[in-house]
C-alpha cells in the first residue's frame, strides 16, 4: 500500500523533519472502520505566514510623511502671504553686509597671522646667517668645536626658517582666496543693492496698480454713468425750455412791430387809392397828408410813420397829379 501511494504521489517514505522546521509530521490514519489497513503517510508542508508588522510600520511612515508634507505646504503658503518684497530685500542686503563684515574680519586676522609669520621667518633667516658668520669666525680662529656648535645652531634656525616659509606660502594662498572672495562678495552686494532699488520700485508700482484696480473695482461705474446721463438729459431739457421761451418772447415783440407797420402801410395804400379814384382835388394833398401834417408828424416823431415810405408816397402823388 505504501509502495502504491509512493508511486502515485511521488513522495518518499523517508522520516520527516521535526515540527520546528517548515514540515509537519506525517499523519497515520486507519480507514474503513476497525479493519486494519496499512497506514497512509502524507507529507504536509507548513506554509509560513508573512509577517505583517513591517507593512503596518511602512503604512504609518507613509501617512506621517504625507501629513508632514501637507503641514509644510500650508506653512509655506502662510509665510508667503506675510512676506513683503521690500522688507525681504532689505533683510537680504543686511545679511550680505554682515557676511562681508565677517569676511573682512577673517581676512584681517589672517593678514595679521601672515605678518607674524613673515617676522618670524625673517628673524630665523637672520639668526641662521648670524650663526653661519660666527662659525666662519670661529673656524678662522682655529676653534673647530666652537665652529661646529655654531653650525648646529645655524642648522636649527635654517630648519625653522624653512618650516616658517612653508607656512607662510600656505598662509598667502589663504589670504589671496579670502581677498578674492571678499571682492566678489562686494560686487555681489553692489549688484544686489541696484537690483533692490529696481525691485522696490517695481513692487511699489505693483502695489499702487493693485490699489487703483481695487478702487476701480469697488466703484459702481454703471450707476455713475447713468447719473451723468440723467443730468445731461436734464440740462438739455432746461436749454430747450429756455430757447423756446426766448423764441416766444421774440416772436411776440416782432409781431407787435409788424402789426404797427402793416397798419401804417394799409392807411397809405387807402389814401393812394382815393387819390387815384379822383376823390381828392387836383393839386391838393390827400386828407391827413398835408405838408404841415407831415412836418408835424415828422417833428413829433410819430413812430408809426417811416420817412422813406413818406418820400416814396410823395413821389407817387406827384406822378398821379401829372397824369
UniProtKB/Swiss-Prot annotation:
Principal cellular location given in the protein's record: plastid
Biased composition (Low complexity): 290-300
The keyword Coiled coil belongs to this UniProt entry's keyword annotation: yes
Locations listed in the record: Plastid, Chloroplast inner membrane; Plastid, Chloroplast outer membrane; Plastid, Chloroplast thylakoid membrane
Keywords attached to this entry: Chloroplast, Coiled coil, Membrane, Plastid, Plastid inner membrane, Plastid outer membrane, Thylakoid, Transit peptide
Membrane topology, as annotated: Peripheral membrane protein
An annotated GO cellular component: chloroplast thylakoid membrane
Coiled-coil blocks: 95-247
Pfam families noted in UniProt: PspA_IM30
Span list, region Disordered: 276-308
Record GO biological process: thylakoid membrane organization
Transit peptide range per the UniProt entry: 1-44
Function noted in UniProt: Required for plastid vesicle formation and thylakoid membrane biogenesis, but not for functional assembly of thylakoid protein complexes.
Family the entry assigns: Belongs to the PspA/Vipp/IM30 family.
Alphabetical list of PANTHER family matching this protein: MEMBRANE-ASSOCIATED PROTEIN VIPP1, CHLOROPLASTIC
Subunit (UniProt): Homomultimer. Complex formation involves interaction via the central alpha-helical domain (71-286).
Name of this chain's protein: Membrane-associated protein VIPP1, chloroplastic
Protein species of origin: Pisum sativum (Garden pea)
Amino acid at each position: 500500500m505504501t509502495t502504491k501511494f509512493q508511486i502515485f504521489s511521488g513522495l518518499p517514505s523517508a522520516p520527516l523533519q521535526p515540527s520546528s522546521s517548515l514540515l509537519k509530521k506525517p499523519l497515520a490514519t486507519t480507514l474503513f472502520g476497525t479493519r486494519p489497513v496499512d497506514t497512509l503517510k502524507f507529507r504536509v508542508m507548513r506554509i509560513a505566514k508573512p509577517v505583517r508588522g513591517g507593512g503596518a510600520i511602512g503604512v504609518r511612515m507613509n501617512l506621517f510623511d504625507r501629513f508632514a508634507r501637507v503641514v509644510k505646504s500650508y506653512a509655506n503658503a502662510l509665510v508667503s502671504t506675510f512676506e513683503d518684497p521690500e522688507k525681504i530685500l532689505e533683510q537680504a542686503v543686511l545679511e550680505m553686509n554682515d557676511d562681508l563684515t565677517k569676511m573682512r574680519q577673517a581676512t584681517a586676522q589672517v593678514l595679521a597671522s601672515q605678518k607674524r609669520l613673515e617676522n618670524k621667518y625673517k628673524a630665523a633667516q637672520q639668526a641662521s646667517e648670524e650663526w653661519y658668520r660666527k662659525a666662519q669666525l670661529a673656524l678662522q680662529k682655529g676653534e673647530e668645536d666652537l665652529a661646529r656648535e655654531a653650525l648646529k645652531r645655524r642648522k636649527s634656525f635654517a630648519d625653522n626658517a624653512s618650516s616658517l616659509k612653508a607656512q607662510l606660502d600656505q598662509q598667502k594662498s589663504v589670504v589671496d582666496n579670502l581677498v578674492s572672495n571678499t571682492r566678489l562678495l562686494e560686487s555681489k552686494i553692489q549688484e544686489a543693492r541696484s537690483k533692490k532699488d529696481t525691485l522696490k520700485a517695481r513692487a511699489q508700482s505693483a502695489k499702487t496698480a493693485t490699489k487703483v484696480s481695487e478702487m476701480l473695482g469697488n466703484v459702481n461705474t454703471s450707476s455713475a454713468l447713468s447719473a451723468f446721463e440723467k443730468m445731461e438729459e436734464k440740462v438739455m431739457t432746461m436749454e430747450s425750455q429756455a430757447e423756446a421761451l426766448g423764441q416766444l418772447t421774440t416772436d411776440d415783440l416782432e409781431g407787435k412791430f409788424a402789426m404797427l407797420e402793416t397798419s401804417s402801410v394799409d392807411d397809405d395804400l387807402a389814401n393812394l387809392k382815393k387819390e387815384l379814384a379822383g376823390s381828392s382835388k387836383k393839386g391838393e394833398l390827400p386828407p391827413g397828408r398835408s405838408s404841415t401834417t407831415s412836418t408835424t408828424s415828422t417833428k413829433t416823431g410819430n413812430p408809426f410813420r417811416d420817412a422813406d415810405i413818406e418820400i416814396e408816397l410823395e413821389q407817387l402823388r406827384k406822378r398821379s397829379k401829372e397824369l
